[in-house]
Amino acid sequence: MITHFRFTAGSRNFWHYHPADQTLLVLDGEGFYQEEGGPKRTIRKGDVIVSPPNVKHWNGATPEQDLICITVTESALDGHAVQLRAVTDEEYGQ
């Protein structure tokens, strides 16, 4: 599945995971990516992030800039994504 996303400045998705590999390609802007238990990373145009199956993570735009990206998610019999909980303001602002 290929998906095009635009996160407006300050927005982010929920903690979630995918049953199969997902590749995120940053087309423009600046954002954040974090895997559970790891540091929050700043991502920018040209960055490529691969999320292995079943690894909990979140991503979104920085407070100042939109984030535009494409994701390519491998097929899995049990769905595209499993939504978990909201990313707290504290987690987002770390």
Place the predicted regions along the sequence by residue.
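Double-stranded beta-helix
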Residues: W58-Q94
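Conserved strand-loop elements at the edges of beta-sheets that form or border functional pockets
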Residues: Y17, L25, I43-K45, A61
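A short glycine-rich, His/Asp/Glu-containing loop-to-beta-strand
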Residues: M1-W15
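Conserved hydrophobic/aromatic beta-strand scaffold that supports enzyme active sites
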Residues: I2-R6, T23, V48-V50
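Short beta-strand His + acidic residue motifs that chelate non-heme Fe in jelly-roll/DSBH
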Residues: F14-W15, Y33-Q34, S51, K56-T62
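Short, conserved beta-strand element in jelly-roll/cupin
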Residues: R6-T8, H18-Y33, V72-E74
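A generic "binding-loop/recognition-motif" signal
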Residues: S11, P19-A20, P39, V55, ...
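Short acidic-glycine-tyrosine-enriched beta hairpin
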Residues: G37-N54
